[in-house]
Amino acid sequence: MVIATQIKECLAAADYGMVLTINDFGIEPRYHATLVKALNRKVAIGELQKVSKGKYYKPKKTVFGSLSPAPSEIVKDLLEKNGKTVGYITGTAAFASMGLTTQITSAIMVGTNRYRRPITRGESKISFLVQPNSITEENIPLLRTLDAIKLIREIPATSPDDSTVVLGKIISALTKERLQQLCQLAEAYKPSVRALLGAILENNNQPTFGLEITLNGVTTYKLPISKNVLPNKHNWNIL
């Protein structure tokens, strides 16, 4: 009876789409098996939906069906641990929010400091992108910009040319201090990312903060970006 009451109170306080774990219900560990059975009964009648083992959410129902949780809810345990930021959403979902694509996807990419194998939670396939820089709330927008440059061939429903134009606008809107931070973070990325970032900065009349010095002067980079979009690309050995 106590378990049923705590479940009812917890669900009443939870927003639609908020992912709840077993620990969120405040039930002693020795009663977790009973709790899981009670939650699974609610899944069976449609009151709850299951994301993965031990993870549930209260679905918001519309005329088109139940809405899935936001990507940040599905992977929130991968984004923060003990109050510290340990990951961030990148890839198509993040690029859409940046105006780089209109593609909608259930796939989620998480930037993290260590390699992890892809996993599946409900209908969402989760992949991981190793991020060599430290991850903080402050630098996440910059890391996403660098990820977009790194993955420029893979951004869906657009072209590398169009993505380069949008990235130019995003980067040009940064303050000089943030531009310098962007270039510092870029030093941990592969040379082709630094070359393309440098070309975008130069083409938009922005300082490059010595990015050219970090590159091998005889190495060339094959990137599918036209001279119409980056007329200065040969300055950065981009073919």
Where are these predicted regions, by residue range?
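Short coil/turn segments at secondary-structure boundaries
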Residues: 22-23, 107, 161
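A short, charged helix-loop
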Residues: 119-130, 137
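Short gly/ser-rich loop at a beta-strand->alpha-helix junction or flexible surface loop bordering the NTP-binding
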Residues: 51-54, 83-121
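Short, surface-exposed loop/turn motifs that are enriched in glycine and acidic residues
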Residues: 64-65, 80-84, 131-138
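Short, intrinsically disordered, mixed-charge
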Residues: 41-44, 94-96, 100, 151
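Hydrophobic alpha-helical interaction segments
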Residues: 135-239
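Amphipathic alpha-helical interface surfaces
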Residues: 35, 90-91, 141
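Short beta-edge/loop segments at beta->alpha junctions of small alpha/beta modules
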Residues: 2-80
